Amino acid sequence: MKADIHPNYVEIEATCSCGNVIKTRSTLGKNISIDVCSECHPFYTGKQKVLDTGGRIDRFKQRFGVFGSK
């Protein structure tokens, strides 16, 4: 590796909107603010909402189901 061409890699704090503080390293060089983290994201907390896409299938069968029956 060449000397003096690489960016400075320092420790920063990423502060979430829920109040959680994560210490990490970055070349940005300043603390950042994030919207979601693993403490408040629905995927990690288990409070994930499941979207119902079955309505589209039912609507299709309702419109075109007549053509399938003889």
Swiss-Prot record:
Keyword annotations for this protein? Metal-binding, Ribonucleoprotein, Ribosomal protein, RNA-binding, rRNA-binding, Zinc
InterPro entries from the entry?
Answer: Ribosomal_bL28/bL31-like_sf, Ribosomal_bL31, Ribosomal_bL31_A, Ribosomal_bL31_sf
Q: Which GO terms describe its cellular component?
A: ribonucleoprotein complex; ribosome
Entry-linked HAMAP family? Ribosomal_bL31_1
* Cofactor(s) for this UniProt protein: Zn(2+)
User: Which is a GO BP term held by this UniProt record?
Assistant: translation
Molecular-function annotations in GO:
metal ion binding; rRNA binding; structural constituent of ribosome
Task: State the protein's name.
Answer: Large ribosomal subunit protein bL31
What role does it play?
Binds the 23S rRNA.
Q: Which family does it belong to?
A: Belongs to the bacterial ribosomal protein bL31 family. Type A subfamily.
How does this chain assemble? Answer: Part of the 50S ribosomal subunit.
PANTHER family in the record, alphabetically? 50S RIBOSOMAL PROTEIN L31, CHLOROPLASTIC (PTHR33280), LARGE RIBOSOMAL SUBUNIT PROTEIN BL31A (PTHR33280:SF6)
